Swiss-Prot record:
It catalyses: an N-acyl-L-alpha-aminoacyl-tRNA + H2O = an N-acyl-L-amino acid + a tRNA + H(+). It is a single-pass membrane protein. SUPFAM superfamilies: Peptidyl-tRNA hydrolase II. This is Peptidyl-tRNA hydrolase 2, mitochondrial. Coiled coil: none annotated. Keywords: Hydrolase, Isopeptide bond, Membrane, Mitochondrion, Mitochondrion outer membrane, Transmembrane, Transmembrane helix, Ubl conjugation. Peptidyl-tRNA hydrolase which releases tRNAs from the ribosome during protein synthesis. Promotes caspase-independent apoptosis by regulating the function of two transcriptional regulators, AES and TLE1. It comes from Mus musculus (Mouse). Belongs to the PTH2 family. One of its GO terms (molecular function) is peptidyl-tRNA hydrolase activity. Gene3D superfamilies: Bit1. There is a cross-link at K78, K83, K97, K108, K117, K179 (Glycyl lysine isopeptide (Lys-Gly) (interchain with G-Cter in ubiquitin)). Ubiquitinated by PRKN during mitophagy, leading to its degradation and enhancement of mitophagy. Deubiquitinated by USP30.
Length: 181
């Protein structure tokens, strides 16, 4: 009990309080001046290396700052609503994981935009493959889902193509002509 009393007495000692107030004021003043004068710490070397590794990717990040993910569903397979939902979920999760690994900054931007996802129709597998090829040439993340074939459709059927997340301008260049599902 005596040690608690002595500790409390030391903490409320005028000299201790003055020291604490001085340190707090100094930190606030330093922080305020740093932000006012624009003196921010430089990027770490790992961040700088990552930026140079992704060079073109960083330069094509959406000019408007908008990002989205597109899920392209084949309509010729006549999948039920639940099947389409499951296949789209597989594509979205796969695309998310790829982007998290390859382009974490793109993923952050997409999340900041509200994680928009749009589902569109493709008439057949050939269209899906053409879209995949075009998206890859633009450097977009792609995720082609093949069904296991345990329920409604043949094993190995390519059901959904996930594109993105990525800059709206690039994704629209690939899928802008497709109709909503």
């Amino acid at each position: 009990m005596l040690s608690k009393f002595l500790t409390m007495e030391y903490l409320v000692h005028p000299g201790t309080l003055s020291l604490a107030a001085g340190v707090a004021c100094g930190m606030c003043l330093g922080w305020g001046l740093r932000s006012h004068l624009g003196m921010f710490p430089q990027n770490s070397t790992s961040e700088a290396n990552r930026d140079t590794e992704t060079g073109t990717e960083a330069s094509i990040l959406g000019e408007s700052g908008e990002y989205k993910m597109i899920l392209v569903v084949r309509t010729d397979l006549k999948m039920g609503k639940g099947k389409v939902a499951a296949q789209c979920s597989h594509a979205a999760v796969s695309a998310y994981k790829q982007t998290q690994r390859r382009s974490p900054q793109v993923l952050k931007e997409w999340e900041y935009c509200g994680q928009p996802k749009v589902v569109v129709k493709a008439p057949d597998e050939d269209t899906l493959i053409q879209l995949l090829t075009h998206a890859k040439t633009l450097g977009l993340t792609v995720s082609l889902i093949q069904d296991a074939g345990r329920t409604q459709i043949e094993p190995g059927s390519r059901t959904v193509l996930g594109i993105g997340p990525g800059p709206v301008e690039l994704i629209d260049e690939v899928t802008g002509h497709l109709k909503l599902y």
